[in-house]
Amino acid sequence: MFAHEEISNSTIDYLIEKVILAMRTHFHGKATLEFTADFHDNAEKMWVNKTSERLTCSKDFYNGVAQRCLDKAEPVSAMHGDLHFGNILYNPYNDSITLLDPRGSYGDHVGCGGDYLYDMCKLSHDLYHGYSELVTGNKYPDYVSWSFSKLVDKYYPTVYNEIIDGGALLIATCIKLHYDCPDRQQRMKDYVNDYAKNISR
């Protein structure tokens, strides 16, 4: 959406906030008792176990981020699981958004339950860290990352650092999945290593 159109800063703010509010209102509600009972084990699989299995670089930093995200994760009734703007359609004629390709699982749980932090970190890896640019070469306007940062601080001030750092973590843990393109893997590896070094200073 942002990569292919001339778009004003106010529209960028509006669209990102619209997605955040939609998730808070329609997805990230109170989880069922059944889902909550096994939440910690499933959250550990999503954050810590997956990180240890896939991580190939800056391991100390990103293992620490994974543990922080696990500590802050809270169960919700529904999450998307792959929430980036490539999976979001906006219809300007009726001001509606459509979410595509939800994950449908969380750890060993099959269904819509999850944690809100994972969804927000997925947005972070796209809007703040530029996942789409790393993969496709299509760069978002610079204002997108600033707008996202501002809105995270507005709606999620207590987990701001986890959302921003967690976005980089999700890039780091998907590098292995891009085995079909070594150049892309190297771009991603360079990015997450540079991010870890700059944050750790």
List each model region and its residues.
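Regulatory N- and C-terminal appendages and interdomain linkers associated
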Residues: 95, 162-201
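Short secondary-structure subsegments characteristic of cysteine-rich extracellular domains
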Residues: 15-16, 23-24, 153, 192-201
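Conserved kinase catalytic-core helix
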Residues: 2-79, 168-171
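Amphipathic alpha-helical segments in well-structured domains
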Residues: 12, 16, 116-120, 189
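Active-site acidic catalytic loop and adjacent metal/ATP-binding pocket
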Residues: 65-114
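Aromatic-acidic/polar surface patches that form glycan- and anion
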Residues: 8, 12, 76-77, 113-116, ...
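Phosphate/pyrophosphate-binding loops and the adjoining catalytic core of nucleotide-dependent enzymes
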Residues: 20-34, 136, 144-152, 162-164
